[in-house]
Amino acid sequence: MVMSCTDPRTLIQHLSTTYPEATQLAPNSVGALQFVFPDGLVINIYPMGTIHFQGQASSIRAEVEALVLIMNKR
């Protein structure tokens, strides 16, 4: 699934703080920052706010989707 976030920097800060167990990988050649969670979920966040979810079903994904929807309403 693909989503768009109006404030990717705040999302990245939130994920780093809320999910310290996730591995945060440095931006790749196209600038995407990647979070890899212990349950197999992978979230790629691109500089312009595009978010790609990969991996198996995860309750974290639902939490992040809800957060992005709230952030986009600001």
PLM regions with names:
Residues 1-3, 48, 71:
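Detector for methionine-enriched segments
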Residues 58-74:
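Mixed-charge, Lys/Arg-enriched low-complexity segments
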Residues 41-63:
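Intrinsically disordered, low-complexity regulatory segments enriched in Ser/Thr/Pro
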Residues 1-42, 64:
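Short Lys/Arg-enriched alpha/beta "domain-start" segment
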